[in-house]
């Protein structure tokens, strides 16, 4: 089967999320819409039709999907869901079946062709602009009852021989020709649509796990499962960490009910960035003290000799490897000076500045590893109504070392949320206003904790320059972990800003 994804159009219903990228690159539940679609068809020939922000789409596919058989088709002046379809059909063999679908659909499984000229997929899961009635007539009526969702399988390209260069596939060509076709209707329940800006923002706010995990909440317990065997080792590292710190009587964790099912006590509490308007400055200081004291308690449980190679892997190799992955997506990457929100900053990845950057990284040495959490951002601990701190989702490893690592990294990750507003980037509460080959302008929603920077530095007992440098590396590393285009740009800018505070 050949897969044709209609990814044209500006996606204006998604507001700021499509200002700088086509809608197929919008993230949903940890993956871009495009990634979700092509992963269902990894052994098929895939054509992606694009127009808006075409260079971004082209570079993105080259960066992240080089292992797939993908061809991108740029429409030339044509509009509507038919635009680019004729161009794609010219590249398909006469007898091959075809899947044609819109890029903003989220399908939790493959679609298969049934013997017919055309199979029209309908759904009752969300509102569609057109529906298919019992006589297989296309009715212009906003409906969630047999709504035409924007996915079709076609026997072969000869069925589509009369499609025009532009216009609407559903209300135009299909409606005009449906009486001449052998049509099958298939209603499916495993389809979702991204929809509008408010729906997408709600999704970002309510996401509780990464795409390879599932979290099930019961009244008094939480069960965590790995959905992808490739990531099972992360769950194993997490279990190992809980066992070790529990054995050493660390109190600031939920009780583990079962390691086999990975079921733990449910802690009722709040994340710091979600309660910022309800807590006074004095309360925030007291809560930050308790978080800091809990980290000190964790770090004091046990120590081992540090691994120099692990330090190099985490601070140097991971940073440079991840930037290498996405550098072609960053339009200002090659600029020696980058104007960020109206101020000029030196770019440490410019060849003339890289040696100085590397020298700073190489000085990040330590003789001792402590037991660490590895990722104590706001999302990974809860504050109860009694202002107790409970950590969860530990990293469980520091490169090759399990459970132990550089305690400075924990403090840097806390700074990442408190001062860096990482959680606003993670939840897409930001906007990239403009960018070009030498500049970027962005706005980032505050978590309301930045004023406690000096208090946090003092609490950590770590040199401020070291925490800033580690945060610089964390933001740069985050670039290569991300798949959201705007987040990549902002994360790189944040890394550059931090570097210029210490260089």
Question: What do these predicted ranges mean?
Answer:
Residues 246-261:
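Conserved HxN/HPN-centered segment at the entrance to the catalytic loop
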Residues 243-250, 273-326, 332-337, 350-365, ...:
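Conserved kinase catalytic-core helix
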Residues 211-243, 265, 273-280:
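ATP-binding glycine-rich loop module of kinase domains
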């Amino acid at each position: 089967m050949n897969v044709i994804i209609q990814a044209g159009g500006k996606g204006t219903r998604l507001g700021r999320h499509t200002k700088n990228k086509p809608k197929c690159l919008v993230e949903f539940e940890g993956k871009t819409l495009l990634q979700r679609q092509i992963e269902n068809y990894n052994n098929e020939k895939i054509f992606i039709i694009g127009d808006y922000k075409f260079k971004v789409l082209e570079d993105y596919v080259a960066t992240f999907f080089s292992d797939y058989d993908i061809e991108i088709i740029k429409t030339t002046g044509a509009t509507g869901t038919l635009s680019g379809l004729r161009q794609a059909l010219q590249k398909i063999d006469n007898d091959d079946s075809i899947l044609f679908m819109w890029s903003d659909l989220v399908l939790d499984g493959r679609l298969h062709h049934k013997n017919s000229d055309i199979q029209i997929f309908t759904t009752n899961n969300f509102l569609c602009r057109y529906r298919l009635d019992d006589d297989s007539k296309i009715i212009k009526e906003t409906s969630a009852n047999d709504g035409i969702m924007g996915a079709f399988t076609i026997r072969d390209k000869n069925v589509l021989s009369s499609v025009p260069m532009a216009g609407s596939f559903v209300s135009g060509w299909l409606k005009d020709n449906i009486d001449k076709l052998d049509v099958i209707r298939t209603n499916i329940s495993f389809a979702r649509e991204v929809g509008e800006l408010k729906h997408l923002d709600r999704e970002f706010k309510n996401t509780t796990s990464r795409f390879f995990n599932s979290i099930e909440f019961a009244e008094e317990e939480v069960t965590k499962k790995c959905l992808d065997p490739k990531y099972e080792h992360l769950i194993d590292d997490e279990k190992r960490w809980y066992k070790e710190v529990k054995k050493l009587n660390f109190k600031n964790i939920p009780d583990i009910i079962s390691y086999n099912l990975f079921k733990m006590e449910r802690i009722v509490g709040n994340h710091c960035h979600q309660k910022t308007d309800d807590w006074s400055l004095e309360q925030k200081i007291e809560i930050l003290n308790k978080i800091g004291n809990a980290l000190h308690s964790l770090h004091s449980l046990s120590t081992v000799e540090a691994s120099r190679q692990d330090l190099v892997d985490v601070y140097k190799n991971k940073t440079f490897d991840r930037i290498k992955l996405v550098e072609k997506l960053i339009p200002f990457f090659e600029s020696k000076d980058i104007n960020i929100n109206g101020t000029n900053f030196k770019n440490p990845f410019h060849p003339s500045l890289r040696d100085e950057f590397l020298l700073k990284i190489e000085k990040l040495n330590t003789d001792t590893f402590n037991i660490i959490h590895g990722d104590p951002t706001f999302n990974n601990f809860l504050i109860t109504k009694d202002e107790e701190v409970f950590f969860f989702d530990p990293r469980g490893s520091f490169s090759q070392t399990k459970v132990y690592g550089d305690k400075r990294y924990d403090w840097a990750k806390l700074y990442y949320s408190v001062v860096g507003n990482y959680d606003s980037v993670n939840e897409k509460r930001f906007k990239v206003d403009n960018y070009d080959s030498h500049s970027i302008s962005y706005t980032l929603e505050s978590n309301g904790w930045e004023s406690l920077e000096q208090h946090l530095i003092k609490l950590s007992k770590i040199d401020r320059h070291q925490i800033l440098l580690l945060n610089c590396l964390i933001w740069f590393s985050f670039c290569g972990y991300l798949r959201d285009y705007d987040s990549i740009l902002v994360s790189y800018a944040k890394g550059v800003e931090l570097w210029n505070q210490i260089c």
